[in-house]
Amino acid sequence: MNNRLNTTSSSEESRFLEEMKRKRVNITLSDTEISGVIQKITQKKTLILEDVSEVRSGRRFPGAKLIFGKEIVKVEFPLSAGQASVFSNEKHKSEFQTFKKKMTLDGEEDGVSYVLIDELHEKFGPAVMHIQEQDVIGIGADVYGQSGQERLCWLQVATKKVVYLFDILLLGGPAFKNGLSMILENTHILKVLHDCRCITRCLRTEFRVQLTNVFDTQVAELLLFFNESGGFLPDRPASLPELLQLHLRLTTAEIQPLCSKQQQSRECVQLWYVRPCPPDLLSLMCSSVQHLLSLRLLLLDALLADYTVLVDSFMSSSHCPPLHFQQDECAVPPELQELMCVRQQRMDWASQCYSQTDSGLLQRSSFKASPHTPADAQ
């Protein structure tokens, strides 16, 4: 058995198998396309199908048919009576059409293109080699399943000019054995993510991959909020669209696709299981990671703002030598002593601009602009 999949909990495996069992599936092999009902999925990603027929000729095969994962080129869930599908009812059809109409981001316009990688030939090796040459990369993931029981479907890796979309459902464990693990566990490559919890859990549980050297934009924003409010915490973490709008100044129209992605992922839980994946979804996956590298730099600058101000103050004070040089150098500089006053001023500002929950957290949605900003307190 694949050792990387043995770590999957028995409850998760049972749930996943039960959801996929008895569904009709179309499978494209290298030389033909067959249709059948899923009877079993093994831990080696081998399918056992029953009621099997060849799509083109309609010829039926007696008994069950064994399909090895490495033989599969494409997987589709067709619409048929009595069978569940991602778009098996009019509601989902309507939702998906609305979703497609809202797609406005074009990676080419922003100087970023994407590369789809769904097999371990041709593009996979060069992609891994290119990523390994980077010092900083953006990482994103799309999963299927409830929190704590997710299954990794897509892994996105962003460089400055290219986003690689790895189809983990098709690639499986061999993708990590052949290079992805070395990238994700490399302590010399900084990985920028937004909310690292889900992807860290999936990588560790499914593939025994330990993600290292991570910059989490969601964590960075929480710390920045804490600093700018004088010690308060928000009632919830910020979403990626919120950060892109606040720090990168993206317009509402520019972040709308990301908002749509979050909504559609909630309403259509099997969205990331669709094979072949619609081009609009591929573009959307690209857009969800292409800004992470720029966002990291802005958040770092914001987090270091107080530090920069203090260094400038120290340098300015050096132009006016104190009368008692030795004594002053041993004492705590006045600039540092002022930090407590600045902190109190920021707390007062935050108390005026936000409503508090019963737990003492600040409600993000209640923000009211104030004539005095945290920057005025510096």
From Swiss-Prot:
Keywords: Cytoplasm, Meiosis, RNA-binding, RNA-mediated gene silencing
Pfam families membership: DNA_pol_A_exo1
Domain (3'-5' exonuclease): residue spans on this chain: 112-304
Domain of life, per lineage: Eukaryota
GO CC annotation terms, alphabetical: P granule; PET complex
Keyword presence, RNA-binding: yes
Subcellular location: Cytoplasm
A single BP term in Gene Ontology: regulatory ncRNA-mediated gene silencing
Major location (coarse): cytoplasm
Record's keyword annotation contains NAD: no
Domain notes: The 3'-5' exonuclease domain lacks the conserved Asp-Glu-Asp-Asp (DEDD) residues that coordinates divalent ions essential for exonuclease activity.
Protein's job: RNA-binding component of the PET complex, a multiprotein complex required for the processing of piRNAs during spermatogenesis. The piRNA metabolic process mediates the repression of transposable elements during meiosis by forming complexes composed of piRNAs and Piwi proteins and governs the methylation and subsequent repression of transposable elements, preventing their mobilization, which is essential for the germline integrity. The PET complex is required during the secondary piRNAs metabolic process for the piwil2 slicing-triggered loading of piwil4 piRNAs.
Protein family: Belongs to the EXD1 family.
Protein name: piRNA biogenesis protein EXD1
Organism field: Danio rerio (Zebrafish)
Lineage: Eukaryota, Metazoa, Chordata, Craniata, Vertebrata
Gene of this entry: exd1
